Design a protein with these regions (language model features):
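Extracellular/periplasmic bilobal clamshell ligand-binding domains
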Residues: 342-382
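A bilobed periplasmic-binding-protein/Venus flytrap-type ligand-binding module shared by bacterial periplasmic
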Residues: 180-187, 222-227, 297-312, 328-331
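Periplasmic-binding protein-like
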Residues: 208-214, 319-341
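Short, polar/charged alpha-helical segment
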Residues: 35, 39-40, 44-47, 64-77, ...
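Extracytoplasmic ligand-binding site segments that recognize negatively charged/polar headgroups
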Residues: 82-96, 108-125, 129-265
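Short beta-strand->loop
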Residues: 151-158, 170-174, 267-268, 283-295, ...
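Bacterial lipoprotein signal-peptidase II cleavage site
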Residues: 8-25
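A ligand-binding cleft/hinge motif common to bilobed small-molecule-binding domains
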Residues: 140-144, 262-286
Length: 382
């Protein structure tokens, strides 16, 4: 059973979404925590020490014994864990249900856009409130939490199975988001389908769609592909995106973008999520042969440094990175674990978002992409 955590003075509802720029959904201010009634957060150093004690007790155990002991420790903590995340409930719900059934530990779940979840954790930390034990959001937002010392260092053998781009000291990737060019097959013939970004940007003026929040996709293509591989100047590459936007509609949300392409309202979308196109495989939607290179960006899961439940938190993180991987693969996502053969085909050429560099240059790339979006001259569709 998925329950909702009452983290603020007014509790979130099951379908609440409060994202801000960069999350792919609408902006809304995070509610204010009342520190007089909120549960007191643990000191980060104490939380890390408690987690280290748990991992030390697990050392040397085989996977089954490790899981069994973690369950025992989690139940001793009270058998509950609070989980904040940005993955839609249709995808993450089966993971939560299976976790509760397999472990006997109940989850309080709050779901919103990645930036909203991040801001909520920042705000709760400032208020000294232990709202979330485990967080799972996009890589760029995970790096911000890490930079604020709001994630605990993870020591788990499961990290060895996670793709290299999704391994960090304090978070790991449960899945990878792959940005692909998708088109409506009723409106775009196989001969007309784009074979390059340049064709996608220039051949579908008036019927092209772009996502309003994909500054990381944009930054990666400009820096690594158009400049790094094709030899353009940065100014030339940015101008190419602006020219594309001048003949495009701008949409907020990849789910909506995929739905509108399938409905025939747009011929081509420049940056759909791969798992969304997989869900529309029976409809007039295609993305193959793929426009390459495909930009990939890890999603992350980690333990919040204010947790008072280290064993339950580690149990949930490890479950998401093992048993939970098949559930994510079943809904078309590309698992972070190399032990699961699913998601984006291996023979597709990819380039990864350089999260560390992007974090240093975030203001620059967000500003440039805002200029691209403004070049469309139209209101954002949402």
């Amino acid at each position: 059973m998925v329950s909702m955590v009452a983290a603020c003075s007014a509790p979130p509802t099951a379908d609440e979404t409060q994202p801000v720029a960069g999350s792919g959904e609408d902006a809304e201010e995070v509610e204010t925590v009342d520190p007089e009634t909120a549960e007191e957060a643990a000191d980060p150093d104490s939380s890390q020490a408690a987690l280290d004690e748990v991992t030390a007790e697990l050392e040397g155990l085989d996977p089954d014994a490790r899981r069994e002991r973690l369950i025992e420790l989690a139940l001793e903590e009270g058998g509950e864990v609070s989980f904040y995340g940005s993955t839609n409930i249709d995808d993450i719900g089966p993971v939560i249900d299976a976790f509760e059934e397999d472990t006997g530990v109940s989850i309080s779940h709050y779901r919103a856009g990645a930036s909203t979840v991040m801001n909520r954790i920042l705000q709760e930390s400032d208020a000294g409130f232990a709202g979330s034990d485990v967080v799972q959001i996009n890589g760029p937002e995970m790096l911000i939490l890490s930079g604020e010392d709001l994630l605990l260092t993870l020591d788990t053998p499961i990290a060895d199975d996670i793709v290299e781009a999704g391994r960090f000291d304090d978070w790991l990737a449960p899945y990878v988001n792959a940005f692909i060019v998708g088109w409506n097959t009723n409106r775009v013939s196989p001969e007309e389908a784009p074979t390059s970004y340049e064709e996608a940007f220039t051949n579908f003026s008036g019927t092209l769609a772009m996502d309003v929040d994909d500054f990381d996709w944009f930054a990666t293509l400009v820096d690594q592909y158009f400049v790094g591989e094709l030899g353009m100047t940065e100014e030339e590459a940015v101008e190419l995106f602006k020219e594309a936007a001048s003949g495009a509609s701008v949409i907020r949300g990849h789910s909506l973008g995929a739905e509108l392409v399938v409905a025939g309202e747009y011929d081509v979308h420049t940056s759909l999520y791969h798992h969304h196109t997989a869900r529309h495989a029976d409809g007039p939607m295609d993305w193959q042969p793929p426009v390459e290179p495909v930009v990939i960006r890890p999603n992350g899961v980690g333990i919040v440094s204010t947790t008072t439940r280290p064993a339950a938190s580690l149990l949930l993180v490890e479950y998401m990175l093992t048993d939970g991987q098949q559930f994510l693969a079943d809904v078309g996502r590309t698992p972070g674990s190399t032990a699961i053969d699913a998601g984006l085909p291996d023979d597709i050429r990819t380039i990864g978002v350089d999260l560390l560099k992007l974090e240093e240059e975030r203001e620059k790339w967000e500003g440039l992409y805002e200029e691209v979006v403004r070049a469309s001259g139209s209101a954002v569709r949402e």
